[in-house]
């Protein structure tokens, strides 16, 4: 619902949500459909909330607009002016998901090479010569090359010598902190404050053990620094207490840091996933993916299907 109707982020997130639930059922991956509330804590946010609701409906998302009276009955401890309820939202055990996908690759005779550096790729006639190093340098010859390397996608795109550098999008690193909360709380669902142009804001979420955590914030950094800056705690407190005034700051403890590979600049609005094939860049057999950040996990299986279709054309 956050993304323009027809964008890759919108279409692949909606399809990916359904595919993930189906895949989790088949593979016995832990997940829960717990629903999500997108909240307005002030009356002057209701117009923006209504626009988000209408955009979600136009994209085919199942949503319910919740009145102030109803949302206050549901969450009497929160300061809320209105909300949107998304019943299909949920949580999934990402390590279990990755393990299942790893098993599928190996079952289909694929090879996963860990701790391996991508050195370069050159196109010769119909094949890519891909040079790698896992302690020893080796080559792979393939008709297809898919670059889906996240935080390193800009660096690795530069190493694909057949590709014009104008198709290489600069990656901007958006660092996000998460705090866990150890006290009592009023939440049984995901709670997302209204997003701004740059991120979805500091939301309340859970893991499958029921641990409540808040995050992420957004801090633009120049390198892959995963250290936790505890000075951001005051910003978290201010943000959370706008809708949960009784939150106890002493129960808010550092949890972890993540970094998102954004292709938007710090002062730019959200940008769509970049998934480029030969019709755009002219290199047959190459699919180049950049800016696969949120909602990347939800979209992941749909992205895989989308890339497979591009290769079949």
Task: Please report, for each region that a protein language model flagged, where it lies by residue.
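Short loop/edge segments at beta-strand edges and connector loops
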Residues: 33, 67-68, 114-116, 254-256
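Short beta-strand to alpha-helix junction loop
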Residues: 4-15, 39-48, 84-103, 227-232, ...
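Helical element adjacent to the flavin cofactor pocket in flavoenzyme catalytic cores
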Residues: 84-144, 301
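Dinucleotide-binding Rossmann-like beta1-alpha1 core, especially the glycine-rich loop
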Residues: 1-70, 201
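A short, glycine/Asx- and small/polar-enriched loop/turn
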Residues: 44-48, 74-81, 122-129, 264-270, ...
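Active-site substrate-recognition segment that forms the wall
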Residues: 29-31, 139, 148-281
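C-terminal lid/capping helical subdomain adjacent to the catalytic/cofactor pocket in oxidative enzymes
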Residues: 270-313
